[in-house]
């Protein structure tokens, strides 16, 4: 890959360690700054963080998490980077309408997905990333959940990606990040936040006798259940925080 000739598609389809040297250096510098900033500003803790990864698996894992704020994306991605992993966040293709955002998201490893469609090309990008050992970060809720009464629609498909990549799903949850930017405010508060990882899930955990589609649905449902269980556990431990 080259700085001036690489397309967005090149960034989606190539491994992050194949990016141009200058881009890799810039990526590391930016993430180091964001890691330090987020740790100082939000003082986040990551409980059971080692459960995200399987040291015996050379492939990446599909990480799923509840979504309340863009701040948690920074915390999650920089934490994974600090652990020596590379992560590819899945994001809505609507963000690509703004060229600077499209450029920025592609440079940090993001993979766009057109929701509500059979976006096979993006599924393949994610599959190949997992096979290279890169992790894939997905927020199944599809958008930030800002209030308790906001309707939530789980966007499926992450189990299919895990199946295509022949790998595991790592559920995790966040708490406190929703409180950082109150409704109507443009500035974040310096509040402590929390994250927690749960037990990995694989297709081998599904009950025997299920057909392929049924197995995928079971894995997806179980992963989401674990994700929300972790969220509820964090919220119970930190009353009043979301």
Residue ranges and their predicted role:
Residues 2-50, 99-108:
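A transmembrane-helix-recognition feature enriched in membrane-embedded lipid enzymes
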Residues 2-22, 121-242:
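Non-catalytic C-terminal accessory region of glycerolipid acyltransferases
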Residues 42, 116-119, 151:
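A conditional alpha-helix N-cap/helix-loop micro-motif detector
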Residues 46, 89, 110-112, 169-171, ...:
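Conserved beta-strand scaffold positions in the cores of enzyme catalytic domains, especially
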Residues 48, 66, 91-92, 109, ...:
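A secondary-structure boundary/capping signal
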Residues 50-56, 128:
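Short amphipathic alpha-helix with an adjacent loop that forms part of the alpha/beta core around
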Residues 55-117:
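Catalytic core of membrane glycerolipid acyltransferases/transacylases, capturing the structured
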């Amino acid at each position: 890959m080259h700085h001036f000739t690489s397309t967005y598609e090149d960034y989606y389809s190539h491994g992050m360690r194949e990016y141009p040297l200058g881009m890799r250096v810039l990526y590391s510098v930016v993430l180091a700054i964001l890691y330090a900033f987020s740790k100082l500003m939000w003082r986040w803790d990551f409980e059971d963080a080692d459960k995200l990864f399987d040291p015996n698996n050379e492939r990446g894992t599909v990480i799923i998490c509840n979504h309340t704020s863009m701040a948690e994306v920074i915390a999650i991605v920089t934490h994974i980077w600090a652990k020596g992993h590379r992560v590819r966040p899945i994001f809505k293709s609507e963000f690509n309408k703004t060229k600077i955002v499209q450029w920025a998201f592609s440079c940090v490893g993001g993979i766009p997905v057109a929701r509500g469609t059979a976006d096979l090309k993006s599924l393949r990008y994610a599959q190949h990333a997992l096979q290279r050992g890169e992790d894939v970060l997905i927020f199944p809720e599809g958008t930030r959940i800002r209030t308790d009464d906001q309707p939530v629609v789980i966007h499926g498909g992450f189990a299919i990606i895990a199946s295509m990549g022949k790998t595991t799903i790592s559920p995790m949850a966040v708490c406190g990040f929703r409180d950082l930017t109150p409704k109507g405010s443009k500035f974040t508060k310096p509040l402590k936040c929390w994250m927690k990882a749960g037990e990995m899930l694989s297709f081998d955990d599904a009950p025997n006798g299920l057909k392929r589609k049924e197995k995928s649905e079971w894995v997806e449902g179980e992963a989401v259940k674990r994700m929300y269980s972790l969220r509820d556990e964090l919220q119970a431990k930190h009353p009043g925080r979301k």
